[in-house]
Amino acid sequence: MHYTSWDRSDRTKPVLLAEDGPEQLGVFSENSAEVDGHFWRTEVSDLGASATLADGSIYRLAGRPGRDKRLEASLNGRTFTFINENSGDWIIDDVDDEKVGQFTARNSGVRKAILEFEHDAEGLTTAEIAGLSWFTGVILDANTQGKAWVWIITLVLASIVALVALFVL
Protein backbone atom coordinates (compact mmCIF):
# COMPACT_ATOMS: atom_id res chain seq x y z
CA MET A 1 0.00 0.00 0.00
CA HIS A 2 1.46 3.33 -1.06
CA TYR A 3 -0.84 5.63 0.96
CA THR A 4 -4.01 5.95 3.03
CA SER A 5 -6.77 8.52 2.71
CA TRP A 6 -10.10 9.29 4.37
CA ASP A 7 -13.65 9.18 3.06
CA ARG A 8 -15.44 11.85 5.07
CA SER A 9 -18.85 11.60 3.39
CA ASP A 10 -20.23 10.73 6.84
CA ARG A 11 -18.59 13.40 9.04
CA THR A 12 -19.36 11.53 12.26
CA LYS A 13 -17.81 8.27 11.01
CA PRO A 14 -14.89 8.88 8.63
CA VAL A 15 -13.65 5.78 6.83
CA LEU A 16 -9.92 5.06 6.50
CA LEU A 17 -9.16 3.79 3.01
CA ALA A 18 -6.23 1.93 1.52
CA GLU A 19 -5.19 4.46 -1.12
CA ASP A 20 -8.43 5.84 -2.65
CA GLY A 21 -10.45 2.74 -1.82
CA PRO A 22 -12.54 0.73 -2.14
CA GLU A 23 -10.62 -1.28 0.50
CA GLN A 24 -11.54 0.01 3.96
CA LEU A 25 -9.03 -0.29 6.79
CA GLY A 26 -11.30 1.10 9.48
CA VAL A 27 -14.25 3.24 10.48
CA PHE A 28 -13.67 5.85 13.19
CA SER A 29 -16.07 7.79 15.39
CA GLU A 30 -15.54 10.27 18.22
CA ASN A 31 -14.54 7.75 20.90
CA SER A 32 -14.11 4.46 19.08
CA ALA A 33 -13.08 2.75 15.89
CA GLU A 34 -13.37 -0.57 14.16
CA VAL A 35 -10.10 -1.42 12.43
CA ASP A 36 -9.66 -4.63 10.46
CA GLY A 37 -12.67 -6.08 12.30
CA HIS A 38 -11.34 -5.17 15.78
CA PHE A 39 -12.74 -2.60 18.24
CA TRP A 40 -10.56 0.32 19.36
CA ARG A 41 -11.35 2.80 22.14
CA THR A 42 -10.00 6.22 21.09
CA GLU A 43 -9.44 9.46 22.95
CA VAL A 44 -8.15 12.87 21.85
CA SER A 45 -7.13 15.71 24.17
CA ASP A 46 -4.99 18.86 24.10
CA LEU A 47 -2.07 16.70 25.26
CA GLY A 48 -2.27 14.04 22.58
CA ALA A 49 -4.30 11.04 21.54
CA SER A 50 -4.55 7.38 22.44
CA ALA A 51 -6.17 4.23 21.16
CA THR A 52 -6.65 1.08 23.19
CA LEU A 53 -6.98 -1.94 20.95
CA ALA A 54 -9.11 -5.01 21.63
CA ASP A 55 -6.04 -7.05 22.63
CA GLY A 56 -5.00 -4.41 25.21
CA SER A 57 -2.29 -2.83 23.05
CA ILE A 58 -2.03 0.94 23.41
CA TYR A 59 -1.18 3.42 20.67
CA ARG A 60 -0.31 6.85 22.04
CA LEU A 61 0.57 10.23 20.53
CA ALA A 62 2.32 12.47 23.08
CA GLY A 63 2.42 16.24 22.71
CA ARG A 64 0.08 19.05 21.75
CA PRO A 65 -1.13 18.17 18.23
CA GLY A 66 -2.24 21.72 17.42
CA ARG A 67 0.96 23.41 18.58
CA ASP A 68 4.02 21.19 18.85
CA LYS A 69 6.33 20.77 15.87
CA ARG A 70 7.54 17.39 17.09
CA LEU A 71 5.27 14.68 18.48
CA GLU A 72 6.23 11.24 19.78
CA ALA A 73 4.10 8.21 18.99
CA SER A 74 4.26 4.81 20.62
CA LEU A 75 2.45 1.96 18.92
CA ASN A 76 2.51 -0.67 21.65
CA GLY A 77 6.19 0.05 22.31
CA ARG A 78 7.22 0.74 18.71
CA THR A 79 8.34 4.38 18.55
CA PHE A 80 7.74 6.92 15.79
CA THR A 81 8.32 10.68 15.63
CA PHE A 82 6.06 13.11 13.78
CA ILE A 83 8.16 16.10 12.66
CA ASN A 84 6.78 19.32 11.19
CA GLU A 85 9.38 20.27 8.58
CA ASN A 86 7.70 23.55 7.59
CA SER A 87 4.24 25.11 7.81
CA GLY A 88 2.00 22.21 6.78
CA ASP A 89 4.51 19.53 5.75
CA TRP A 90 5.17 16.63 8.12
CA ILE A 91 7.31 13.50 8.05
CA ILE A 92 7.19 10.40 10.23
CA ASP A 93 10.49 8.83 11.30
CA ASP A 94 11.01 5.51 13.04
CA VAL A 95 13.34 4.92 15.99
CA ASP A 96 16.32 4.67 13.59
CA ASP A 97 15.52 8.09 12.06
CA GLU A 98 14.39 6.38 8.86
CA LYS A 99 11.50 8.09 7.10
CA VAL A 100 8.33 5.99 7.29
CA GLY A 101 5.88 8.42 5.71
CA GLN A 102 4.83 11.99 5.02
CA PHE A 103 1.69 14.12 4.88
CA THR A 104 0.69 17.72 4.30
CA ALA A 105 -2.04 20.20 5.18
CA ARG A 106 -1.76 21.81 1.75
CA ASN A 107 -4.20 21.37 -1.14
CA SER A 108 -6.88 18.99 0.13
CA GLY A 109 -4.53 17.55 2.75
CA VAL A 110 -6.80 18.31 5.69
CA ARG A 111 -9.93 16.89 4.05
CA LYS A 112 -8.37 13.67 2.78
CA ALA A 113 -5.48 13.50 5.29
CA ILE A 114 -3.39 11.48 2.85
CA LEU A 115 -0.49 9.69 4.52
CA GLU A 116 2.09 8.52 1.97
CA PHE A 117 4.29 5.62 3.07
CA GLU A 118 7.87 4.91 2.10
CA HIS A 119 8.48 1.45 0.60
CA ASP A 120 4.72 0.73 0.45
CA ALA A 121 4.43 0.54 4.26
CA GLU A 122 6.77 -2.45 4.36
CA GLY A 123 7.19 -3.77 7.90
CA LEU A 124 4.02 -2.14 9.24
CA THR A 125 0.94 -4.09 10.31
CA THR A 126 -2.55 -3.01 9.27
CA ALA A 127 -3.16 -1.80 12.84
CA GLU A 128 0.05 0.28 12.81
CA ILE A 129 -0.86 1.77 9.42
CA ALA A 130 -4.30 2.65 10.80
CA GLY A 131 -2.78 4.10 13.99
CA LEU A 132 -0.32 6.32 12.14
CA SER A 133 -3.08 7.40 9.74
CA TRP A 134 -5.43 8.24 12.62
CA PHE A 135 -2.68 10.27 14.35
CA THR A 136 -2.17 12.11 11.04
CA GLY A 137 -5.85 13.07 11.02
CA VAL A 138 -5.69 14.16 14.68
CA ILE A 139 -2.70 16.44 13.95
CA LEU A 140 -4.27 18.00 10.85
CA ASP A 141 -7.64 18.54 12.59
CA ALA A 142 -5.96 20.15 15.61
CA ASN A 143 -3.96 22.53 13.40
CA THR A 144 -7.09 23.50 11.48
CA GLN A 145 -9.06 24.19 14.67
CA GLY A 146 -6.27 26.40 16.03
CA LYS A 147 -6.20 28.47 12.85
CA ALA A 148 -10.00 28.75 12.82
CA TRP A 149 -9.98 30.36 16.28
CA VAL A 150 -7.40 32.93 15.16
CA TRP A 151 -9.58 33.89 12.18
CA ILE A 152 -12.74 34.11 14.30
CA ILE A 153 -11.08 36.37 16.87
CA THR A 154 -9.57 38.54 14.13
CA LEU A 155 -12.95 38.96 12.42
CA VAL A 156 -14.71 39.80 15.70
CA LEU A 157 -12.08 42.43 16.56
CA ALA A 158 -12.21 43.89 13.04
CA SER A 159 -16.01 44.10 13.29
CA ILE A 160 -15.80 45.93 16.62
CA VAL A 161 -13.26 48.40 15.21
CA ALA A 162 -15.47 48.98 12.16
CA LEU A 163 -18.56 49.61 14.32
CA VAL A 164 -16.66 51.99 16.60
CA ALA A 165 -15.29 53.86 13.58
CA LEU A 166 -18.76 54.03 12.00
CA PHE A 167 -20.61 55.34 15.06
CA VAL A 168 -17.92 57.36 16.84
CA LEU A 169 -16.18 59.06 13.95
What is each residue range found by the language model?
Residues M1-L132, G137-L140:
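Cationic, beta-structured binding surfaces that engage anionic biopolymers and membranes
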